Amino acid sequence: MKRLSLSPMEKEILKAVHVARRFPIVRFELHSSQEPGLRSIALNHVYITHPEDSMELVKERSAALEGLRKKGLVRISYALPAYVQSDYQIYYQSKLYELLCHTAMEAQGKEGFLFDFPAMRFGQVFPK
């Protein structure tokens, strides 16, 4: 039997997923006000535990979540029929979401910039 190798971050997140009642994550997206169907993923599998979490830390967590998904240890879904709004409050308060909003605001009205509307897609991580 092949033994899975997990990074320290993957181990930490996997443990947290197993003990959590719900494990909310988000996907930061940029949408276009000019082309309604046009969207771009700014940052995938965003897991924030503190509003001040750095981009570097969030990217490390994102990579760990993707690694756990690819190894078949978790399932990630952004197609939620219902969610608990308070689970996602920290994401709205985060410095990274503020940065996404400022980036989109700067693009508004500039020629050639299509992605001018920040969005957040709610997701959940489920243990397998």
PLM-predicted stretches and their roles:
Residues 1-56:
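Short, amphipathic alpha-helical interface elements at domain boundaries
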Residues 3, 47-58, 98-111:
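Short, Lys/Arg-enriched charge-dense amphipathic segments
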Residues 22-40, 76-100:
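Internal, charge-rich low-complexity segments
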Residues 51-83, 92:
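Short amphipathic alpha-helical interaction segments
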Residues 82-128:
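Short, amphipathic alpha-helical interaction segments positioned at domain boundaries
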